[in-house]
Amino acid sequence: MSLDVDIQIASEEADLPSEEQLILWAQAALRETGDREVTIRIVDAEESRELNAQYRGKDKPTNVLSFPFENPPGLTLPLLGDLVICAPVVFNEAVEQQKTAAAHWAHMVIHGMLHLQGYDHIIDEEAEVMESLETELVTSLGFPPPYATNSSLAEG
């Protein structure tokens, strides 16, 4: 099982994660077997806002958008899909949530990769499964649990 990751940088932000980090985090979240391919595109707020408005009807930038690839009938390609991650939103959320930038970036890559593999968080039961898996994967990489509150971090 291998994952081929195409990294596209379309952001002016400084201090972006390295390609090696992005690939490591994407590989950590791969649940499917066989050879797979994914594109991770790092963008600024305007591109994220445009895509979020076009595909989700929300006229604001968002942290990560996932675009799963659907094989046409009779054709099997190894494509998982595309992730579009908005650098300024991820950096701002990390500060707001009192996380390191690396921890939040890892979480967003894992979150998006799970969406590409069919995980979702709209229904409570599905959200519990997805969030539990995200927590397991993020902590396996040495980061704190992504959904811990600031008070629970202070307590222990």
Curated annotation (Swiss-Prot):
The GO terms describing molecular function are:
metalloendopeptidase activity; RNA endonuclease activity; zinc ion binding
Q: Where in the cell is it found?
A: Cytoplasm
Give a single Pfam family match: YbeY
> Under which EC number(s) is this enzyme classified?
3.1.-.-
Concerning its family, UniProt says: Belongs to the endoribonuclease YbeY family.
**Main location, first listed in the record:** cytoplasm
Entries under InterPro entries matching the protein: MetalPrtase_cat_dom_sf_prd, YbeY, YbeY_CS
Function of the protein: Single strand-specific metallo-endoribonuclease involved in late-stage 70S ribosome quality control and in maturation of the 3' terminus of the 16S rRNA.
Q: Where does Zn(2+) bind?
A: 111, 115, 121
Q: What is this protein called?
A: Endoribonuclease YbeY
Q: Which GO terms describe its biological process?
A: rRNA processing
Which source organism? Hahella chejuensis (strain KCTC 2396)
One GO cellular component term noted in the UniProt record for this chain: cytoplasm
Classification from the root reads: Bacteria, Pseudomonadati, Pseudomonadota, Gammaproteobacteria, Oceanospirillales
The UniProt note on the cofactor reads as follows: Binds 1 zinc ion.
Identify the keywords attached in UniProt to this record, alphabetized: Cytoplasm, Endonuclease, Hydrolase, Metal-binding, Nuclease, Ribosome biogenesis, rRNA processing, Zinc
PROSITE patterns in UniProt: UPF0054
SUPFAM superfamilies membership:
Metalloproteases ('zincins'), catalytic domain
Cofactors: Zn(2+)
Q: Give the top-level enzyme category.
A: hydrolase
